C-alpha cells in the first residue's frame, strides 16, 4: 500500500497450540495505480521468511480488480505461501485449486452480503448511477450470503492440502461445505 497508509499490511497469529500463521494483505495495481508495486510489496513481506520453518502457514488476502493480475501473482508466489485468496470484485470465482507447488488459490472469494443486489448495493440506485452518475448508493437489505474458503495446510511444510469454497445462505448456490461441517471437522463450538 502507499507509504503512510493506516494499517499493518501483515500480522502474525499464534494459535493456542503454538502454530504461527502470517497473514498478508496486498493491494494490486491494475486500475489502482497509486498502490505500491504489489509483487515487490509481497516479496518484502516475505523477505528472509521460509514457509514451514518460520511460519506454519502464510495466507495472502489479495485485493484487486483484474483476474489476470491475481492469477499472475499466485503463479509467481506458488510454493512460497500457503494460500492466496483474491478479494474486491464482490463476485466469487469458481477456480479454487491447489497450484503445482502447493499454494491454494481462488481468484476471488466474493463478498459477504446480499447478492440480490448490484455487488451489495441496492439495485435501483446502482442502476440509476450508470445513467445519471449522481446516485448515492446504499447497502442492499435482505438475506446475505457468506462467502469464503476453507484451506487445510500441512503443519510442517506449510503447503496446502485442500481448498474448499464456502457459500452459505442467500440466493447463490450453496457449497457442500458449510459452517456446521467445518465445526464438526475442527471441533468448533457452533
Q: Over which residues does each language-model region extend?
A:
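Acidic, metal/ion-coordinating pockets
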Residues: 1-190
Amino acid at each position: 500500500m502507499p507509504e503512510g497508509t493506516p494499517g499493518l499490511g501483515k500480522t502474525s497469529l499464534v494459535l493456542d497450540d503454538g502454530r504461527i500463521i502470517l497473514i498478508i494483505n496486498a493491494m494490486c495495481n491494475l486500475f489502482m495505480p497509486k498502490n505500491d508495486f504489489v509483487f515487490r510489496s509481497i516479496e518484502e513481506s516475505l523477505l528472509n521468511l521460509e514457509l514451514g520453518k518460520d511460519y506454519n502457514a502464510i495466507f495472502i488476502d489479495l485485493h484487486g480488480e483484474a483476474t489476470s493480475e491475481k492469477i499472475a501473482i499466485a503463479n509467481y508466489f506458488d510454493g512460497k505461501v500457503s494460500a492466496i485468496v483474491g478479494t474486491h470484485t464482490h463476485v466469487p470465482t469458481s477456480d479454487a485449486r491447489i497450484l503445482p507447488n502447493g499454494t491454494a488459490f481462488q481468484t476471488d472469494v466474493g463478498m459477504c452480503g446480499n447478492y440480490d443486489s448490484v455487488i451489495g448495493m441496492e439495485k435501483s440506485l446502482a442502476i440509476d448511477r450508470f445513467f445519471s452518475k449522481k446516485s448515492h448508493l446504499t447497502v442492499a437489505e435482505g438475506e446475505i450470503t457468506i462467502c469464503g474458503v476453507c484451506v487445510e495446510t500441512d503443519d510442517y511444510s506449510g503447503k496446502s492440502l485442500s481448498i474448499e469454497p464456502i457459500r452459505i445462505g442467500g440466493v447463490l448456490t450453496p457449497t457442500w461445505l458449510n459452517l456446521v461441517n467445518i465445526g464438526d471437522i475442527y471441533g468448533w463450538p457452533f
